[in-house]
Amino acid sequence: MRIGLFGGSFDPIHLGHLLAASQAQEVLCLDRVLFVVAARPPHKVPVAPAEARYEMTLLAVAEDPRFTVSRLELDRPGPSYTVDTLRKARRLFPQDELFFITGADAYRDVLTWKEGERLPEYATLVAVARPGYPLEEAPLPVVPLFVPEVGISSTEIRRRLKEGRSVRYWVPRAVEVYIEKHGLYR
């Protein structure tokens, strides 16, 4: 099988993430895409708790059989290092072809990650192209994934929510309801 591991904070997950996952699944002929929610990313501090981000991601992908949500990082103590996640995934899926998918902005600093230079040993690296982050400058070989630009970011969604503005059509409706119910990002 060909499995995509889509890593991110998903703080919150939004339609841009889902579009990127769908594009990755189609372009790379993936049998499935596992959303890997970062529990404790070492390079940034999430706003919402890990379990809330996990639950929102579950809600976001519930109706798409191509997508599942993984607890690979959530059930492991300590910081969420990508190399540890990929090692664990390689043990879980020893015969499968793995693709690690994340934004081009993240790959810019991949060599500062714990054992970042070793990531290609465990999975093919796939970078979702973003304006301002040329993939030619990526420090490790990556497969570029071009996704239509939607101009949606988790940062902008959190800002809008803090200002009391709507995020309808920015996130799946179930995620919007979850955010409202739990008073997140206020």
Curated annotation (Swiss-Prot):
What does the UniProt keyword field contain? Answer: ATP-binding, NAD, Nucleotide-binding, Nucleotidyltransferase, Pyridine nucleotide biosynthesis, Transferase
Organism superkingdom: Bacteria
**UniProt pathway annotation:** Cofactor biosynthesis; NAD(+) biosynthesis; deamido-NAD(+) from nicotinate D-ribonucleotide: step 1/1
Which reactions does this protein catalyse? nicotinate beta-D-ribonucleotide + ATP + H(+) = deamido-NAD(+) + diphosphate
Catalytic activity, EC: 2.7.7.18
CDD domains the UniProt entry points to: NMNAT
Q: One Pfam family, short name please? A: CTP_transf_like
Gene Ontology MF terms in the entry: ATP binding; nicotinate-nucleotide adenylyltransferase activity
Under InterPro entries, the record lists: Cyt_trans-like (IPR004821), NadD/NMNAT (IPR005248), Rossmann-like_a/b/a_fold (IPR014729)
Give any single GO term for biological process: NAD biosynthetic process
For the keyword Nucleus, the answer is: no
What is the top EC class of this enzyme, as a single word?
transferase
Keyword Nucleotide-binding part of the UniProt annotation: yes
Similarity comment: family membership: Belongs to the NadD family.
According to its UniProt entry, what is the function of this protein? Catalyzes the reversible adenylation of nicotinate mononucleotide (NaMN) to nicotinic acid adenine dinucleotide (NaAD).
Q: Which HAMAP family match?
A: NaMN_adenylyltr
This one is known as Probable nicotinate-nucleotide adenylyltransferase
